[in-house]
A protein has these predicted regions:
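N-terminal Lys/Arg-rich, disordered targeting/topogenic segments
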Residues: 1-8, 367
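Extracellular glycan-binding segments that recognize GlcNAc-based cell-wall polysaccharides
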Residues: 7-16, 25-364
Length: 367
């Protein structure tokens, strides 16, 4: 009986040691993969503690001083998309704010920049008078640019752009299904002075009227037939270029190929794709005026950069990637569930061995 107890004790001890060694080997392997992952690129990051902190870090990178800024509601990616070409034209930052409160980090950044005037994009239900009152407390003037809906707001912004420089090209983005495509297109469109008209099926006639009234020569339709049917091309008298892919990732790459000289392309910004977290779009739009100035495109990624995206970067000679709003993770060989499971097994084994020892002492070896 004594030999049997010793044998069982050794088995349990060996099992615990093997479990710990196995878990340790997984961690070592994961650490190695993390170090090697994307090692062919120089990696930089602009990541704050929250969305507002990330905005201020983008602002700090792009603007030492700016007498003007643009405010967009955190609930209106649509207005954010149409605002980027104006922000680029005026060389001013964009901040996304709550409808009734300016985050303290944004307030501090406004003071650092020396902002004297803010353009509020959208109606009062998006950015209320409480925002106006806070601006007054900061001795900052404001001007509201808005229409009765997102389409009309985008038209107002386009007209503002036209006041400073006559527009000959426009882009159409579907405000319902085309937001992901619109976000990553903004830097390239803005750099070329192309305003973005946000529209849906109900506003297409008004969009066509705007194109005709301004003698637009060329129209970029961003997105596939789900966003815009082929019939829209027949209604537009200008030259039409449709940029589309099978999904947001492929459309993203098509946009870059359309507007960028890929032979000279060596840097890129990477943001998360917005599938899980809406704030990812806000990161991209805050970044967009700066990316437009630098002529650096934005690429979508999930938590890990996909094989197709990595190949796209390598094929186009990208050597520097800047991760904005998040840090790209390497492929996981150890998931959180695996860690929890392995830890639970180790704890059970340790408790079992400890319990056996206690029972043995308690019953003087009879167990």
């Amino acid at each position: 009986m004594k030999h049997k107890n010793i044998y069982n004790k050794k088995n349990i001890t060996i099992t615990i040691i093997l479990a710990i060694l196995f878990l340790a080997s997984l961690f070592i392997a994961q650490d190695y993969l993390d170090k090697e992952y994307l090692s062919q690129f120089e990696r930089k990051s602009i990541v704050g503690s929250d969305r507002f902190d990330t905005m201020t870090k983008i602002s700090e990178k792009g603007w030492g001083k700016s007498k003007e800024a643009i405010f967009v509601s955190i609930h209106s990616v649509i207005d954010g998309i149409s605002s980027v070409p104006l922000a680029y034209q005026m060389d001013i930052p964009i901040f996304f704010v709550d409808k009734e409160e300016i985050n303290i980090k944004i307030k501090q950044e406004l003071k650092k920049l020396g902002v004297e005037k803010v353009y509020l994009i959208g109606e009062k239900d998006l950015l209320t008078n409480k925002i106006v009152n806070e601006l007054k407390e900061l001795n900052i003037k404001y001007k509201r640019i808005y229409g009765k809906n997102n389409f009309e707001t985008s038209i107002k912004i386009a007209e503002k752009i036209n006041e400073n420089s006559e527009i000959k090209e426009v882009a159409l983005v579907n405000m319902v299904t085309g937001k992901p495509d619109g976000v990553v297109a903004t830097p390239m469109l803005a750099r070329r002075g192309i305003p973005i008209i946000m529209q849906n099926k109900q506003s297409i006639d008004d969009a066509v009227e705007f194109i005709q009234n301004h003698n637009i020569d060329k129209v970029y339709i961003i997105g596939n037939e789900e966003n815009f049917t082929e019939s829209i091309e027949e209604d537009i008298s200008a030259d039409v270029v449709r940029i589309q892919g099978s999904d947001r990732y492929e459309t993203n790459k098509k946009i870059i190929n359309e507007f960028c000289d890929t032979e000279d392309l060596n840097k890129i910004y990477v943001i998360r794709d917005g599938i899980v977290n809406y704030a990812d779009f806000l990161n991209g739009l805050t970044l967009a005026p700066l990316a437009a100035r630098e002529d650096i495109p934005i690429l979508y990624s999930s938590d890990s950069l996909g094989k197709k995206e990595i190949k796209f970067l390598e094929d186009n000679g990208i050597n520097e990637i800047t991760e904005v709003g998040f840090n790209i993770q390497g492929p996981r060989i150890i998931s959180h569930k695996m860690i929890e499971f392995a830890s639970s097994i180790a704890i059970i084994l340790i408790w079992t061995l400890g319990l056996r020892r206690i029972m043995k002492k308690q019953f003087k070896g009879t167990f």
